[in-house]
């Protein structure tokens, strides 16, 4: 059995790590970077992932997909998706099942299918490092992800060819990375995780007893639609509005210009973490009847902070709620860990420090901690990491809809998982022969205001007055936070159960089809790579042969030269096509046709040695002749 890798599947960047001895190691990708942009681009010939996809985004905005994690497990009609539709350069569309999917070149793609491309890149990165196949992974998700979003992440893993052994919450993973091997007896830490698209806050207690470490999540909260992308969007809106005031042109109508502004806004935001001001300079951003337009706007740190202060404030409000849920005061928090690239912003660090009355730790890498923690969890599951117990919680309350449209909670939020809970319900009408179990997730009393995870029917209930039948409903949450629900008629023993597959989720058939598509694409990608290699080889051989013809000169007879040049022309024509077999055949034909060239080159080399010797002798004679002449 191979290693279980740890993957931080991020909104903006992703990272992969693996246990190397007793320590987790972050693995560099093919480009030499420790993190990979979570960007996927579809071109005419191939699918690009990471930095190559990011580099061509400006020229291919409609088919370059980013921040897909914000769509995963979400309904098209949801407020968050409708907000994203207005600002994304690519087309978000409604799937047949009501999910938010993406339209690329006329094909509808599911977010798990797109995210699987990033996971495949992480898988390949690990395989290249380990020198062996990788089939198992621990993947992280925001702590505040609901069941549909967790299921969709597992689906993405399956499509990428990975058996997802565990889904682990990002703040919990960061705590594992921070606390593993610590000798402190008892400490309570706050993990503030503000990433590219999601925000989480978790209060975690780390205990050491007899050499065994226990990581217990006391409470968690957050917002799955708050992150660096939202900060970027505030800067983008500011730049576009300022340009419109100056030039009267709205850049939102130009996808290519919008992509340039997005890149510049992200760069400006990052620069303002260390500088007090920066200039956004985009020449030839657009043009009208009067000619080309240039964008040059100065952005100060103070302006950036004014644009995003409400976003930072909303994260601090979540801190207050989670501390209360954990039953802890600010003074009881020993350490604060900042995770996610957006926590590099000075305003974020300042507000967190003000809230806790102490500075956050600086010795945790905000980009890598989550992947390292996932790798540690992989080591725990594999048995390579001993004496570590992880106790996570469910982030949202779970229950069913009961009479009057009320949500009756069976499992409260922040309950340690895995867990199982049963409760007995009854019928609302006389002689009712069936009941519908509507499963909900959320904190609102009104059933319709919560997230619907799915519903099923329990039929065959014996006729009886209302309130008499006893229907036992059981919720079972596994260590991934994935839910199974069953309903049993205690009188007849009849039982109906479902593993919650939200109405918005992918069916097993769809996932299997996507797995097959991914495998087919992998084969197509391999063939394309082989074709490119054959073309490159053909180009190299043609160039080298031409050079040899020049060097051979008259040593190569005219007939042979004509045959070789014809073979070069045939090869160059084949290299422009897509038939690798033909390119290989024409390459071999050129090599064979070039045999006289090799013989001519050898003959010329041998002939070159003889004249060189003669020239040397002539030099000696001339010298002697001149010597005699002088003596006369």
Swiss-Prot record:
InterPro entries: ATPase_NBD (IPR043129), Chaperone_DnaK (IPR012725), Heat_shock_70_CS (IPR018181), HSP70_C_sf (IPR029048), HSP70_peptide-bd_sf (IPR029047), Hsp_70_fam (IPR013126). Residues 599-632 are annotated as: Disordered. The modification Phosphothreonine is found at residue 198. Induction: By stress conditions e.g. heat shock. Keywords: ATP-binding, Chaperone, Nucleotide-binding, Phosphoprotein, Stress response. Acts as a chaperone. Belongs to the heat shock protein 70 family. This is Chaperone protein DnaK. It comes from Actinobacillus pleuropneumoniae serotype 5b (strain L20).
